[in-house]
Amino acid sequence: MKKILFITGTRADYSKIKSLMYRVQNSSEFELCIFATGMHLSKNFGYTVKELYKNGFKNIYEFINYDKYYQTDKALATTIDGFSRYVNELKPDLIVVHGDRIEPLAAAIVGALNNILVAHIEGGEISGTIDDSLRHAISKLAHIHLVNDEFAKKRLMQLGEDEKSIFIIGSPDLELLNDNKISLNEAKKYYDINYENYALLMFHPVTTEITSIKNQADNLVKALIQSNKNYIVIYPNNDLGFELILQSYEELKNNPRFKLFPSLRFEYFITLLKNADFIIGNSSCILKEALYLKTAGILVGSRQNGRLGNENTLKVNANSDEILKAINTIHKKQDLFSAKLEILDSSKLFFEYLQSGEFFKLSTQKVFKDIII
């Protein structure tokens, strides 16, 4: 029986791979193994590893890769060491990683250097931040590419990746949106939310803008307070500068119009997002999940500059006046939803490729494919 090893370090990447992991776990042909690390094991960010157990997953290996200082470079080195030890003991046949963070980078390095096939989900995406460098580095280490669309496929081919190693499966988390059965009343009761109307806030640090992050967050908080609306605030990820954003959020803690959470369970988050007046911040879900659920969005700052926008989203600088103006006009965007996302049966496609042996026909010896210009 082949062992399929997934690594997950955040609530975000877990939502992307959850449906794929279910397919593997429910199969009699493969053994699912999970390496849980990163933010999942931090009480400051909601100790979200418990969600994996609640969802019925087994074979979970927990590994703490951060110390109290949350230094990303040290966490990368620690993850490489811990993942290497685990892999040498487990001897997996395939390592599956997602996205652009240090945890998948560590796993891809270990896989590449140990001649183990690595499959990378959502390579070929661009955001316009340092995340792109990590994502493309992971793609160059990976042997199998599971991408969203033709745009991502072509970008990987520009990076010299073999077309035969690229499989379009769509975005795996979107299929979960159709299966969500949590009602709005249930979600509000679970998190003690008493607002009739509300918006969501998700604002993450841009590591290359560390000197201005505090000012950006202060401007955002100022605009939100002045708007006189209700907000459900979800903590940022643990990238460099997250503490500065949390410092700005201190001003919101005793304000009854703000409810702050380190993390939300994915199913409950989706229900709250679907029923929100709008979502504001710089999370990629503003351009994907919110679009699919027909929730208008306000993108603040540069974090998603490289991604395709749409007419349902307002883009503003991290300036309090611009942000407040966008909040006051966002209701006009909510009837414009002409943009559509193609939803593929991602987990089914993934499992069919896995079952057919397509992945295992690929060599761990990569060859750069030139594009004739």
Curated annotation (Swiss-Prot):
Catalytic activity: UDP-N-acetyl-alpha-D-glucosamine + H2O = aldehydo-N-acetyl-D-mannosamine + UDP + H(+)
Designated name of the protein: UDP-N-acetylglucosamine 2-epimerase
Function: Hydrolyzing C2-epimerase involved in the biosynthesis of capsular polysaccharides. Catalyzes the C2 epimerization of UDP-N-acetylglucosamine (UDP-GlcNAc) and the subsequent hydrolysis of the product to form N-acetyl-D-mannosamine (ManNAc) with the release of UDP.
Disulfide bonds: none
UniProt KW keywords: Capsule biogenesis/degradation, Hydrolase
Organism superkingdom: Bacteria
Family from the record: Belongs to the UDP-N-acetylglucosamine 2-epimerase family.
Gene: HS6.10
Species in which this protein is naturally found: Campylobacter jejuni subsp. jejuni serotype O:6 (strain 81116 / NCTC 11828)
Coiled coil: none
Pathway: Capsule biogenesis; capsule polysaccharide biosynthesis
Ligand binding (UDP): 11, 15, 101, 204, 237, 283-284, 289, 303
EC number(s) from the headed UniProt entry: 3.2.1.183
